[in-house]
Amino acid sequence: VGADGTALQKPNSAQKEKMIVYKNSIQPSMVSETPAAYEGNLWKRLSQSKFRSSFTLKANDRHYVIEKGMDTVRSHATDFIRDRLAPAEPKNDGKQTPMRGHPVFIGQHATGTCCRSCLEKWHHIPKGRELTETEQKYVVDVIMEWIKRQMQTL
């Protein structure tokens, strides 16, 4: 029974797939949604952080994206996330993402996907376990959405 006295229904299998266990409770997972769906939530929260909103793509980063193309940058993001963020205990966690050198690194800091602590804080994906393929795709999608938005601004 819910707080309002109405009967609660158990989630169906599709709904269960959209949920993760988080700190001994079930929380809706954002991993199955598209980043654009969080216009009023994720992007707003990130924009309100002085640190996160300070990151922008510089001219050389923009040139790199134009030269390589979004598909190649997405491929790099996929590799970086798989190798540096997805393990349950990433090497040098909290320090594994450089502050410059690749548009994806800048995007990771801007979106709170740079380390497992930030991923937990900003995206409610718990640390201490390996990221699922769906979670990895979500992280890449968030970063690529940020890069796309940056490429549309001057």
Task: Give the residues covered by each predicted segment.
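Extreme N-terminal basic, low-complexity initiation segments
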Residues: 2-12
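Polybasic, lysine-rich low-complexity intrinsically disordered segments
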Residues: 10, 16-18, 24
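Core of compact, soluble alpha-helical bundle domains
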Residues: 33-81
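Membrane-interfacial helix-loop segments of redox and metal-homeostasis proteins
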Residues: 58-68, 83-85, 96-97, 101, ...
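Immediate flanking context of iron-sulfur cluster ligation sites
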Residues: 92-111
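Iron-sulfur (Fe-S) cluster-binding segments and ferredoxin-like electron-carrier domains
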Residues: 117-138
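Short Fe-S-cluster ligation motifs
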Residues: 138-154
